[in-house]
A protein has these predicted regions:
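Short glycine-rich or small-residue beta-strand-to-loop segments that form or flank ligand, phosphate
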Residues: 135-139
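Long, low-complexity, Lys/Arg-enriched
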Residues: 1-134, 144-198
Length: 198
């Protein structure tokens, strides 16, 4: 029954999106689809990151709050830090959706988007919140931010994740709801070049 209903809801969401009713489509998504998307994501991705619980999750926030919520709901970190640039902090939808679905997180605003600023901010956050198991979610970040975070993850023994998708609708420029999955981009336990890539 749930599968049939989500398929009907996806069609309804697509119809609203394609007919130019962007606000109605967005409202419909959050009212009728996102809870199911979260449930599926948690159910289908429990084994992606194995080992100890996540002490610190650092998420890079872009213009869509969904990857931040999905990553945090799945990983259930002890501490969740959401890093964003100045432009993103003005996005009311981000604040509303993150506040609705998550309860324990800290926002940190970047002074600028340079490599050194993001790298130093990540380093500062790990000194404030020491962690044995740190995960960085790069889904929302710009490419330059993702590159900085990737280098930082390598230097500081952090997992690097990306909320990806298997189905994409080009007309809405969004993933099909329910097709999201967790991509473990880098893991120091799996990917250290000197150990595993000879």
């Amino acid at each position: 029954m749930e599968e049939r209903n989500i398929e009907l809801d996806i069609r309804r969401w697509l119809d609203l999106s394609k007919s130019g009713k962007a606000k109605e489509a967005k409202d419909f998504y959050y009212e009728n689809l996102f809870d199911t998307v979260i449930e599926r994501f948690e159910k289908n991705n429990q084994q992606v990151i194995s080992g100890s619980s996540v002490d610190v999750l650092i998420s890079i926030l872009g213009f869509s709050p969904e990857p931040i919520v999905l990553g945090a709901k799945l990983l259930k970190p002890k501490t969740h830090i959401i890093i964003h640039d100045a432009g993103v902090s003005l996005n009311e939808e981000n604040n509303r959706i993150i506040g609705k679905y998550l309860t324990d997180y800290h926002f940190v605003e970047l002074q600028d988007e340079t490599f050194s600023c993001l790298y130093d901010t990540l380093k500062e956050q790990l000194s404030i919140h020491p962690a044995q198991h740190c995960v960085i979610n790069i889904t929302g970040g710009k490419k330059s931010m993702s590159a900085s975070a990737g280098i930082f993850a390598r230097d500081f023994f952090c997992d690097l994740i990306y909320v990806d998708y298997s189905k994409y609708d080009p007309s809405t420029r969004r993933p099909e709801p329910g097709s999201e999955f967790l991509n473990l981009v880098y893991s120091p336990y799996r990917d250290l070049p000197e150990l595993f890539h000879k």
